[in-house]
């Protein structure tokens, strides 16, 4: 069993001291049977290899393909194929504020069609669940640069009664200073990174949103919450503990 100290401080254990407890799995999030299997990973790897600079020799491409095949579980095959962590869970502290509830807004036909497409996709991915909540926010459909529709949640009223998290974000100058003398740089991108962060079960009902059919709430962190950036930075600091500003930014 691998053990990770995420506290940032040394920890000491006595011989024979229990380190963990095992419990049966009671809930699985996002475990959707995939029809893609190995073929799905193969297609993703082929696409990545095809994007390599033409000046890279075939031997290097082959070794890269072997490396990617070795770590296929960390590759995303499609928009709903993503990870999930509860190392850090997002909290929404509203103290004793009354639940905020917006009246259902009228949506245009194209917007309603976009919502009808989005909701089932989020349900299948395990990102949302049906909600019976006193909180309610509306969906706002906006156009992306490519002309397609994106569904966002109007959390302005919720944010107004949420206690702000002042967790510090990295300073740009410190990040630039840490790269002094470095020659090679790599970047890693997460598929829908916020959606890979769990929302604490006690706070899920506060993310409830309404549409022309039902109300739903998020199981994972959506965009639009005022403290989402702080939560994600806290998660990255835990995951990269001991590496940040040394070999990782």
List each language-model region with its residue ranges.
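Retroelement reverse transcriptase polymerase core
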Residues: 4-16, 25-249
């Amino acid at each position: 069993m691998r053990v990770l100290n995420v506290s940032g401080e040394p920890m000491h254990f006595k011989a024979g001291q229990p380190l963990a407890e095992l419990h049966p799995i009671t809930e699985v999030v996002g475990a959707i049977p995939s029809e893609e299997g190995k073929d799905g990973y193969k297609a993703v790897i082929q696409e990545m290899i095809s994007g390599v600079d033409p000046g890279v020799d075939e031997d290097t491409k082959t070794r890269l393909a072997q490396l990617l095949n070795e770590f296929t579980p960390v590759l995303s095959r499609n928009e709903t194929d993503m990870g999930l962590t509860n190392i850090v869970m997002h909290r929404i502290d509203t103290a004793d504020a009354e639940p905020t509830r917006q009246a259902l807004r009228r949506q245009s036909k194209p917007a309603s069609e976009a919502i009808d497409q989005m909701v089932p996709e989020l349900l299948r991915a395990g990102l949302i669940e049906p909600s019976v909540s006193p909180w309610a926010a509306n969906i706002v459909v906006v156009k992306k640069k490519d002309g397609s529709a994106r569904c966002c949640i109007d959390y302005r009223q919720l944010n107004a009664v949420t206690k702000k998290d002042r967790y510090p974000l990295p300073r740009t100058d410190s990040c630039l200073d840490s790269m002094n003398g470095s020659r090679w740089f790599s970047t890693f991108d997460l598929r829908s990174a916020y959606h890979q962060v769990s929302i604490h079960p006690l706070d899920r009902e506060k993310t409830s949103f309404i549409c022309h059919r039902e109300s739903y709430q998020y199981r994972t962190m959506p965009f639009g919450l005022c403290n989402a950036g702080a939560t994600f930075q806290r998660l990255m600091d835990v995951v990269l503990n001991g590496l940040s500003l040394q070999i990782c930014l």
